[in-house]
Curated annotation (Swiss-Prot):
The gene is sucC. GO terms for biological process: succinyl-CoA metabolic process; tricarboxylic acid cycle. Its EC number is 6.2.1.5. Belongs to the succinate/malate CoA ligase beta subunit family. Heterotetramer of two alpha and two beta subunits. Pathway: Carbohydrate metabolism; tricarboxylic acid cycle; succinate from succinyl-CoA (ligase route): step 1/1. This is Succinate--CoA ligase [ADP-forming] subunit beta. The keyword Phosphoprotein does not apply.
Length: 388
């Protein structure tokens, strides 16, 4: 989950990372009041989850509260690379002597953590990597040893930060590592990390990505969710603890187990080439507990997707046997009633497959078609979607 800058800074404050005073708002009037309360020049900063805000006019210096009001009026509603500014951060402006770059991230390719540090801050780090690679330090971080003050100082030194700021920078770098670990982040980035004329080291910007797979350890992170930008179907699925991702096709997919669902997406996409190019509409893994309630919740989400024309239920019975899955489907259709109005193709295999198929045959629901194989089911679901 990507955070807005103001949310990242909330985590920074929580862990003692020095930053600048500021508050978030969604009105120009509040921006003026906040600026007056701060009593110093401020920065008005668009809160969008995309880079290039400054170049797009989303970051402005305001010397007075009236300037803050004017800039806030112009920035609120500003479109930055397709992201509409709905909130702004009003933060105290700081005098800057130098700008640096620091980040911690998950290096998936090398299966480790990585610290990146550069004396060339304030510009796109991709540009630094391309034009001045020798100025960007990439330092692997041992997950067990972590980052102590000595190692943090080494990171700053390898990033070519001036000798006179190494100790102060090390303190901030270690605290940023604390944010990374304690909050289960996959990215913590500060650009710029600044040195003031008074030799303070401050995080004047912040980017944090949280690992949603660790969300169970952080119920407090729920407040960071950007509800306005989240697909309502994905929100509904999350409320029911369903592993759901919306796609752009016409065939709804329900399966048990991520691997099976991924395979089903491929098979449906391939079958769709013979039926007008229809594609999978979603990824939905109901896991091992395919109860009536879980199946009903899954079908409810998929059937409320206007793009879905048919549904392919592909289940391999294991711990949860096929007869339990079949009963779940029958009961789910009863629960949904008239809301179940799109054809379902069901393929069962594995534990108690014969019993499961018998249950569905005897139920004789007009929307349900049985398939013997995954290929057959995918083809039938694609055919039904293309015909609607």
């Amino acid at each position: 989950m990507d955070l807005f800058e103001y949310q990242a800074k909330e985590l920074f404050v929580k862990h003692g990372v020095p930053s600048s005073e500021g508050r978030v708002t969604d009105t120009a009037e509040d921006a003026r009041a906040i600026a007056a309360e701060i009593g110093k020049p401020v920065m008005i900063k668009s809160q969008v989850k995309v880079g290039g805000r400054g170049k797009a006019g989303g970051v402005k210096y305001a010397a007075t509260p009236e300037d803050a009001f004017t800039h806030a009026q112009n920035i609120l509603g500003l479109d930055i690379k397709g992201h509409i500014t709905k909130k702004i951060l009003v933060a105290e402006a700081k005098d800057i002597a130098e700008e640096y770059y620091i980040s911690f991230l998950l290096d998936r390719a090398n299966r480790t953590y990585l610290a990146m540090c550069s004396v060339e801050g304030g510009m796109e780090i991709e540009e630094v990597a391309a034009t001045k690679p020798e100025r960007l330090a990439k330092v692997p971080v041992d997950a067990v040893k972590g980052v102590d003050l000595a190692f943090a100082r080494s990171i700053a030194e390898q990033g070519h930060l001036p000798a006179e700021v190494l100790d102060a920078a090390a303190v901030t770098i270690q605290k940023l590592w604390e944010v990374f670990v304690a909050e289960d982040a996959t990215l913590v980035e500060v650009n710029p990390l600044v040195r003031t004329p008074q030799d303070e080291i401050l995080a004047l910007d912040g980017k944090v990505t949280l690992d949603e797979n660790a969300g169970f350890r952080h119920p407090e992170h729920d407040e960071f969710a950007d509800v306005d930008a989240t697909d309502p179907l994905e929100l509904k699925a999350k409320e029911n603890d369903l592993n759901y991702v919306k796609l752009d096709g016409e065939v709804g997919i329900i399966g048990n187990g991520a691997g099976l669902v991924m395979s089903t997406l491929d098979v449906v996409a391939y079958a769709g080439e013979n039926h007008g190019g229809v594609k999978p509409a979603n990824f939905l893994d109901i896991g091992g507990g395919a109860s009536a309630e879980v199946m009903a919740a899954g079908l409810d989400v998929i059937l409320n997707d206007a793009q879905v024309k048919s549904v392919f239920v592909n289940v391999f019975g294991g711990i949860t046997a096929c007869d339990a899955v079949a009963n779940g489907i029958v009961k789910a259709l009863e629960i949904l009633g008239d809301e179940a109005n799109k054809p379902l193709v069901v393929r069962l295999d594995g534990n108690k497959v014969d019993e499961g198929r018998k249950i569905l045959v005897e139920a004789a629901h007009p929307l349900v078609t049985l398939a013997q194989t995954m290929d057959e089911g995918a083809d039938k679901a694609a055919e039904l979607a293309a015909a609607r």
